[in-house]
Amino acid sequence: MTVVTRATTPQPFTDSGVTLLPNYFTGLVPPTPLRSDIDIDACPTATRTLMQFADNLGRAVGYDRERGGQVIQDIFPVRSTEHQQVSSSSKVVLGSHTESAFHPHKPRYVVLLCLRGD
């Protein structure tokens, strides 16, 4: 018999509203892709875990201007952009920014899941 459990989202641990949920099983993590022009669900178990937490906060949505409206965006480092100010960089600290600052329907939450710090 399989027992399905629902991920629960605790109250924020900090005054800034950040909640850190370490050590959740995300399945096997594949090698980092060599190119950024591929559309993959690199880790389906991680995607389901992320969506379970997001579902507790509200309805997950995507914006047309951000990766064509994808709700889940697999972002991974790419060697050719490692020193640039882009989402696929890995050797620089990204500057603080938002793509939806002037959108009439701003997000209330941003949910991030890190699979590997490479």
Q: What positions do the PLM features span?
A:
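Fe(II)/2-oxoglutarate oxygenase catalytic core
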Residues: 1-118
